[in-house]
C-alpha cells in the first residue's frame, strides 16, 4: 500500500512539472508569435512602413533603447549616421519620423494659429511633470496653461525682474571676490547652478533657495541636475519596447514614474538614503508653501502687476485660469519644470562660455575692451540688459555659447493631430510624431564651418543668413522655450 502511495505521489509530481513546463512553453510560443507578428506588421503594413531607415529600428524600440539607455544617450549620434545613409527623412523607431532639413523646421514647429500641435505622450511618460504646461499634450489646454506665463517672461516682464537679477549678480560677484586669494578650487558648474537656481527660485517663490551663500555653492544641486539628465532616458524608455509586455504595460501603467515613487517614500527617509534629492525637495517645499500663501493672500491682479517682486504663480493665480488649473499640486509641478529648465540650461551655457573666455586670452581681452565703457561706473551702477544687448561681441559670444551648449540636443517630437505633414514626396500621416534635432542643425558644417569650435567671430559683420535659420536653441513655434528672452 505504501509503495502504491509513493508511485501516485511521484506521478502527480511529474504531471505537475510537465504541466508547468507546458504552460511556460505555451506562453513562450505565444509571445514569440505575437512579437513576430508585430514586427511583420510594423515592417510591411504600418502607415510608416515605406519610410527610409534601418529595418530593425522600424521593427522594435529595443534598438533605440540600446543606444539611449545601455549606451547612455548615444541615439542622437546614431540618428546622424542614419541621415548620412538614408537621407533627410528617416523612421527611427516603429512610431516616429525624424527630419534633418532646416528649411522644414518651421513646418514642424509651428505657431499656434497655424495649426494644432501636440506632443508625443511617450515623451512625458515617467518623468513626473504631468500637468505642467510643457508636458500638456492637448493643443488647446497647453495654450490655456501657457498663456498666463507669457507676460511674465516677455521683454516687459524681464524689465521688471532686472533689479532682482542685478541683486543676485552682485551677490555672486561678492562671493567670488571674497574667495579670491583663498587657494580654494571653485567649480564653475556649481557656481552657475547656484546663481541660476537662486534667480529662478525668486521667480517661482519670491524666496531663493539661497544656494549662493552655501560654502560650496550647493554642489549637491548641480550633481542632482546631472543625475536627472542621465536618468531621464531610462524612464522615458521604461515601458518595454516591443511585444505583449509593451501592450500590457501601456494599458495598466505597469511602470510607475519617479515622481509617484518619490511621493510614496517618507521625506526624512528619502533624504537619509539619497541626500542628492535634498535640493529638489527643498525647492518643491518652497514652491508649495509659496503657492498656498499666495492663494491665502488673494491679492488683486493690479497689486500683483505693480509689485516687481511678484512671483510667476501670483500672476497665474490672479489670471483668468479656472480654479481646477490653479490646484497646488499642478502648480508645484509647473514650478519644478521652471526650476529644472531655468537652472540646468542657464548654468550649462554660462559655464560653457566662461570656460572659453578663461582659456582664450584674445577673447577675454576683446570682451573686456567692449565692456569697459558700460562698466565704467561699476560697482555704483550696472549696465541694463538693453545696454548689454547692444554689445556685438558679447552677443556673438552668447549666440555661439547657445549654439554649442544646447538646451536640448535630441529631437523634440511634435504631432499634427488633424492633418498630414507633407515633406517633398512624403506624406506623413496625421498623428505621427515628427521631430528635428538642434544638434543636427547646430553642427551643419556647410552652415557653420568648423562646427565644433567656439568661434564668436562667425556672428559678426555680414555673416551667412543660414546661421540664423539653423539656430534653434529655444526651439520655435507655440511650444518654444518661455525663457528665451
UniProtKB/Swiss-Prot annotation:
Q: Which GO terms describe its biological process?
A: terpenoid biosynthetic process
Q: Which InterPro entries match?
A: Cyt_P450, Cyt_P450_CS, Cyt_P450_E_grp-I, Cyt_P450_sf, Cytochrome_P450_monoxygenase
Topological relation to the membrane, as annotated: Single-pass membrane protein
* Catalytic class of the enzyme: oxidoreductase
Lineage top rank: taxon: Eukaryota
GO CC field? membrane
Q: Does the keyword Nucleus apply?
A: no
Q: Where in the cell is it found?
A: Membrane
User: According to the record, what happens upon gene knockout?
Assistant: Leads to the accumulation of talarodiene.
Tell me which residues bind heme: 481
Q: Which cysteines are joined by disulfide bonds?
A: none
Q: Give the matching Pfam families.
A: p450
Q: What cofactor does its activity depend on?
A: heme
User: Which pathway or pathways does this protein act in?
Assistant: Secondary metabolite biosynthesis; terpenoid biosynthesis
GO MF terms listed in the record are: heme binding; iron ion binding; monooxygenase activity; oxidoreductase activity, acting on paired donors, with incorporation or reduction of molecular oxygen
Keyword Ligase appears in the UniProt entry:
no
Q: Which UniProt keywords apply?
A: Heme, Iron, Membrane, Metal-binding, Monooxygenase, Oxidoreductase, Transmembrane, Transmembrane helix
Show the stretches that span the lipid bilayer: 20-40
**Enzyme nomenclature, EC number:** 1.-.-.-
Q: What does this protein do?
A: Cytochrome P450 monooxygenase; part of the gene cluster that mediates the biosynthesis of talaronoid C, a fusicoccane diterpenoid with an unprecedented tricyclic 5/8/6 ring system. The first step in the pathway is performed by the fusicoccadiene synthase tndC that possesses both prenyl transferase and terpene cyclase activity, converting isopentenyl diphosphate and dimethylallyl diphosphate into geranylgeranyl diphosphate (GGDP) and further converting GGDP into talarodiene, a precursor for talaronoid C.
Q: Which family does it belong to?
A: Belongs to the cytochrome P450 family.
| Protein name, as recorded | Cytochrome P450 monooxygenase tndB
What is the native source organism of this protein? Answer: Aspergillus flavipes
Amino acid at each position: 500500500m505504501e509503495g502504491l502511495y509513493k508511485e501516485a505521489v511521484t506521478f502527480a509530481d511529474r504531471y505537475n512539472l510537465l504541466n508547468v513546463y507546458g504552460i511556460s512553453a505555451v506562453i513562450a510560443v505565444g509571445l514569440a508569435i505575437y512579437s513576430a507578428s508585430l514586427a511583420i506588421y510594423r515592417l510591411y503594413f504600418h502607415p510608416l512602413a515605406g519610410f527610409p531607415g534601418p529595418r530593425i529600428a522600424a521593427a522594435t524600440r529595443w534598438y533605440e533603447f540600446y543606444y539611449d539607455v545601455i549606451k547612455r544617450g548615444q541615439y542622437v549620434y546614431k540618428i546622424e549616421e542614419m541621415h548620412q545613409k538614408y537621407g533627410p527623412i528617416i523612421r527611427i523607431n516603429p512610431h516616429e519620423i525624424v527630419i534633418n532639413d532646416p528649411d522644414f523646421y518651421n513646418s514642424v514647429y509651428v505657431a499656434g494659429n497655424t495649426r494644432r500641435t501636440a506632443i508625443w505622450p511617450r515623451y512625458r511618460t515617467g518623468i513626473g511633470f504631468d500637468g505642467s504646461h510643457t508636458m500638456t499634450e492637448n493643443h488647446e489646454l497647453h495654450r490655456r496653461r501657457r498663456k498666463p506665463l507669457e507676460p511674465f517672461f516677455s521683454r516687459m516682464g524681464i524689465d521688471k525682474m532686472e533689479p532682482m537679477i542685478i541683486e543676485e549678480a552682485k551677490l555672486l560677484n561678492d562671493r567670488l571676490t571674497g574667495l579670491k586669494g583663498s587657494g580654494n578650487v571653485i567649480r564653475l558648474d556649481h557656481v552657475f547652478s547656484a546663481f541660476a537656481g537662486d534667480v529662478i527660485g525668486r521667480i517661482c517663490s519670491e524666496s531663493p533657495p539661497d544656494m549662493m551663500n552655501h560654502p560650496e555653492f550647493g554642489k549637491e544641486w548641480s550633481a542632482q541636475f546631472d543625475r536627472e539628465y542621465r536618468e531621464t532616458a531610462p524612464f522615458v524608455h521604461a515601458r518595454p519596447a516591443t511585444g505583449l509586455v509593451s501592450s500590457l504595460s501601456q494599458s495598466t501603467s505597469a511602470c510607475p514614474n519617479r515622481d509617484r515613487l518619490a511621493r510614496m517614500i517618507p521625506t526624512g527617509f528619502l533624504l537619509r538614503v539619497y541626500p542628492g534629492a535634498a535640493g529638489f525637495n527643498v525647492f518643491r517645499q518652497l514652491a508649495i508653501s509659496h503657492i498656498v500663501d499666495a492663494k491665502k493672500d488673494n491679492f488683486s491682479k493690479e497689486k500683483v502687476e505693480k509689485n516687481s517682486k511678484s512671483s510667476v504663480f501670483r500672476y497665474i493665480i490672479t489670471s483668468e485660469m479656472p480654479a481646477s488649473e490653479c490646484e497646488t499640486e499642478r502648480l508645484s509641478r509647473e514650478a519644478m519644470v521652471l526650476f529644472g529648465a531655468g537652472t540646468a540650461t542657464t548654468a550649462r551655457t554660462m559655464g560653457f562660455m566662461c570656460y572659453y573666455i578663461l582659456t582664450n586670452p584674445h577673447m577675454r581681452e576683446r570682451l573686456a575692451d567692449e565692456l569697459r565703457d558700460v562698466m565704467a561706473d561699476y560697482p555704483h551702477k550696472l549696465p541694463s540688459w538693453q545696454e548689454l544687448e547692444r554689445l556685438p561681441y558679447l552677443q556673438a559670444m552668447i549666440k555661439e555659447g547657445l549654439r554649442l551648449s544646447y538646451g536640448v540636443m535630441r529631437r523634440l517630437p511634435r504631432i499634427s493631430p488633424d492633418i498630414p505633414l507633407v515633406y517633398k514626396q512624403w506624406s506623413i500621416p496625421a498623428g505621427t510624431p515628427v521631430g528635428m534635432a538642434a544638434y543636427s542643425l547646430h553642427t551643419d558644417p556647410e552652415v557653420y564651418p568648423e562646427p565644433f569650435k567656439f568661434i564668436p567671430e562667425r556672428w559678426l559683420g555680414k555673416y551667412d543668413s543660414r546661421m540664423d535659420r539653423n539656430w534653434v536653441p529655444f526651439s520655435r513655434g507655440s511650444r518654444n522655450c518661455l525663457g528665451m528672452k
